[in-house]
């Protein structure tokens, strides 16, 4: 049986984010990274698709430095639902095959200034496993429920008031994700 310590010397975790020009987004992802690292012991980095640093390739370099015997990177897009970024952009940026044809550029020849054309190549000889988007995980549903209940308990509405709950999400250009 392989021990967790042996795995920690060979496997690292890459949390993939879209990236934002707003500094609090980076602070939030670094906090998630630090909490995950502390809870699991696995070397963990955040890699950003665009706008923020480190890039996905830069984060892979950081993991290689932190784990000299690195054999495998488990990459998870920190996205709620599958879409263009999780199925096309992130696999491409990791040097993997996209999971489907890009409706923005079906021939795969992106314009010279497109971020997929100008991104650094990932330099890693080991295995990269790309996990799916987070999806409707029960733990996420618990967080949503807790936040809504906190809001309702802080509400100044009386018991006769009617309250609706609206979940807002980004959406996707993919045909099967238009609901």
Locate the predicted segments by residue.
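Extended amphipathic ligand-handling, pore-lining, and cofactor/metal-binding catalytic surfaces
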Residues: 1-179
């Amino acid at each position: 049986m392989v021990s967790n310590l042996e795995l920690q010397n060979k496997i690292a975790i890459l949390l993939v984010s879209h990236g934002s020009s707003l500094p609090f987004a980076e602070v939030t992802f670094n906090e998630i990274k630090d909490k995950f690292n502390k809870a699991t012991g696995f070397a963990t980095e955040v890699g950003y698709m665009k706008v923020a640093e480190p890039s996905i390739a830069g984060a892979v370099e950081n993991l290689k430095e932190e784990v000299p015997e690195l054999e495998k990177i488990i990459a998870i897009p920190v996205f709620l639902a599958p879409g263009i970024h999780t199925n096309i952009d992130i696999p491409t940026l990791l040097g993997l095959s996209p999971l489907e044809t890009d409706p923005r550029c079906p021939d795969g020849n992106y314009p010279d200034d497109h971020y997929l054309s100008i991104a650094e190549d990932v330099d890693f000889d080991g295995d990269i496993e790309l996990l799916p988007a987070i999806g409707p995980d029960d733990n996420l549903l618990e967080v949503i429920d807790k936040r809504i209940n906190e809001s309702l308990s802080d509400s100044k509405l009386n018991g006769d008031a009617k309250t609706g709950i609206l979940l807002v999400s980004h959406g996707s250009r993919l045909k099967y994700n238009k609901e």
